[in-house]
Amino acid sequence: MSSAALMEEIRNAQRAEGPATILAIGTATPANCVIQADYPDFYFRITNSEHKTELKEKFQRMCDKSMIKKRYMHLTEDLLKENPKMCEYMAPSLDARQDMVVVEIRKLGKEAAVKAIKEWGQPKSKITHLVFCTTSGVDMPGADYQLTKLLGLRPSVKRLMMYQQGCFPGGTVLRLAKDLAENNRGARVLVVCSEITAVTFRGPSDTHLDSLVGQALFGDGAAALIVGADPDTAIERPLFELVSAAQTILPDSDGAIDGHLREVGLTFHLLKDVPGLISKNIEKSLIEAFKPIGINDWNSIFWIAHPGGPAILDQVEHKLAPGRRANSRATRHILSEYGNMSSACVLFILDEMRKKSARRREATTGDGLEWGVLFGFGPGLTVETVVLHSVPAITA
């Protein structure tokens, strides 16, 4: 056998035969639940800003329009009283924030991962790869290492750590997991997105309303998936197939969403026209993603879109599926019940989609539809587009 033929044989033996599939999903939140209607009073009181009455009224309107009913946060009143610098707008406080998040990110991630592994039903020794994503808590060794230890995974697990990405990488982790599963025969990839807002919490400022927007929207949560190709259907139950995945930077979007880690924590900066930039460009991503499948009716697919805020959802819907709010029902439900959990959000929506489909006795895991799309939006502006194929309910 020639060297070329031998190499081809080796490469073929290393690759899976079928597409990557999502085999299990687990989610977790902190115990502390924040009711959105009560949050403006709490926020301005705990930050000693009650004298800023006009600003509080603006914040109240932001919260009222957010479509959020409640959020979950690690930060409690007691924790904030113990760390008063975090309640100021721009006080040096990074050490206190880091001390919290490096511990809580991995703990919350573990909670979600344990649930996913339990649903999967297989020994954790079968996990071959770990992808961990978080916006905060940069540390060495990273949260991927810490989670490997917490879960008792094999030391030879191949790890990938993603820090400081923002809101879009719920799609990125699926893209990476797909590549890992399809190019490593027998691979089982544990994917974890864990987000804690302690690094971004700060008091209000009259001159930086974009920071206030984040205080009205963000919540804490973690989601975990098991991804693998060629599932053994005698012991594994596929939920969705990962058909394709793409990433793009939107034109003319420099500075639309920025985040900067400083002594004061992580600061966010938003342009007003983020919803417009996304809605203006989103159809191009859809056309490119679904052209190989021959689909151009966006009402015929199920939707999982990162809920950066109600304005983004409204404008994307108006652009692609006017009058069809049903397309984003699961997305709006998660926004309402949890707020914007950054990278974890779309994975929560994925979980809600399959559970809602089962409750309603739909024909597939995708709200009764065969094909779907998952969008991640975030700094850049970066858009992740993942094409999903649902699974018949009889095997889900």
UniProtKB/Swiss-Prot annotation:
Root EC class: transferase
EC number: 2.3.1.74
Active site per the UniProt annotation: 167
Keywords, ordered alphabetically: Acyltransferase, Flavonoid biosynthesis, Transferase
Any one GO molecular function term: naringenin-chalcone synthase activity
GO-annotated biological processes: flavonoid biosynthetic process; polyketide biosynthetic process
Pathway: Secondary metabolite biosynthesis; flavonoid biosynthesis
Keyword Ribonucleoprotein: no
Reaction catalysed by this enzyme: (E)-4-coumaroyl-CoA + 3 malonyl-CoA + 3 H(+) = 2',4,4',6'-tetrahydroxychalcone + 3 CO2 + 4 CoA
Cited InterPro entries: Chalcone/stilbene_synt_C, Chalcone/stilbene_synt_N, Chalcone/stilbene_synthase_AS, Polyketide_synthase_type-III, Thiolase-like
Membership in a protein family: Belongs to the thiolase-like superfamily. Chalcone/stilbene synthases family.
Role according to the record: The primary product of this enzyme is 4,2',4',6'-tetrahydroxychalcone (also termed naringenin-chalcone or chalcone) which can under specific conditions spontaneously isomerize into naringenin.
Name of the protein this chain belongs to: Chalcone synthase
Organism: Chrysosplenium americanum
Record gene name: CHS
